[in-house]
Amino acid sequence: MKRIEVLLLGILAVAVGLFGCYYFLVHERIDKVGPEFTVEEKLLEISVKDPEEVLMRGIKAIDDRDGDVTDSILVESIYGINSNQETTVTYAAFDNAGNVSKIQRQVRYKDYEPPRFEAYTTLCFAGGKKFDLLDYVGARDVLEGDIRRRVHATLVSDTENINAEANHEVRLQVTNSLGDTAELTIPVLVYSPDWYNASIKLSENLIYLERGERFNPRNYLETFVVRGDPIDISAAVPSDVSVEVENEVDTEVPGVYVVTFILSKSVNSVTHSGIAKLIVVVE
């Protein structure tokens, strides 16, 4: 009986030993090491207009078993932007065993600008009708283009309802894919329908100017609509149309300004007037 037990224990010991050897050999054959990166330029300088392929410049990946796996490199993320217009790009590379290696480097967009807001109409509305301000404002980004769907609007004036007849102040906010957030507080006028019975169309409704840039507000007048008839005022305002322009824009002082236009025309002894506001951001 004891001999049988000893024999069984011996067989078990041999089996465990053989399994250990097999596991060791198999385990050693499994590739658990990812590729290694080499980067020629620690800081890559590019333009926002460059294609994404430019981000691959000067970066390679070599695997100890598969060799050159540079073709497997992809951009995993681009995030963050500092005052030097530098962002962090994360790269990932893969070998044939599915191992993944990652590396980060700084990329500087030499012509980067934060997102800018747009207004698709003059922000002057006749009271008595509900409207959604986000239908009339948006934002553009130098990298992503149209990002209007990310714009948020918050009423910051004492008025409680954007549809109420009043001079409102609204803060716009938008964030691009880099995490860069732009904010702008703008005026929104909701007037009594009895005040104005004509409309003014501007060529632009929200503009950005560089400090010291020359500015003539009349250059933005486009059309004056009276009783449904459009009057072209882009080149010159007809003599039978009166123009009032309230302009306090100082391009030497950064800030947000508003130019107010009021146009009037008499038809059959009835005066028809319209109002429009141009928002000017001096950077």
Regions found by a protein language model. Give the residues of each.
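Compositionally biased, intrinsically disordered low-complexity regions enriched in proline and serine
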Residues: 23-24, 80, 92, 110, ...
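Flexible, low-complexity linkers/stalks enriched in Thr/Pro that connect modular domains
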Residues: 29-31, 108-112, 189-193, 281
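Serine/threonine-rich, repeat-prone extracellular segments and beta-strand-based repeat modules
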Residues: 1-12, 64-105, 144-190, 227-283
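N-terminal membrane-anchoring alpha-helices
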Residues: 5-6, 23-26
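Solvent-exposed, low-complexity, repeat-rich "mucin-like" stalks and linkers
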Residues: 25-66, 113-146, 196-234
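Hydrophobic alpha-helical membrane-insertion segments, chiefly the h-region
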Residues: 14-24
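A broadly tuned "polar low-complexity/structure-edge" signature
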Residues: 193-194, 213, 217, 221, ...
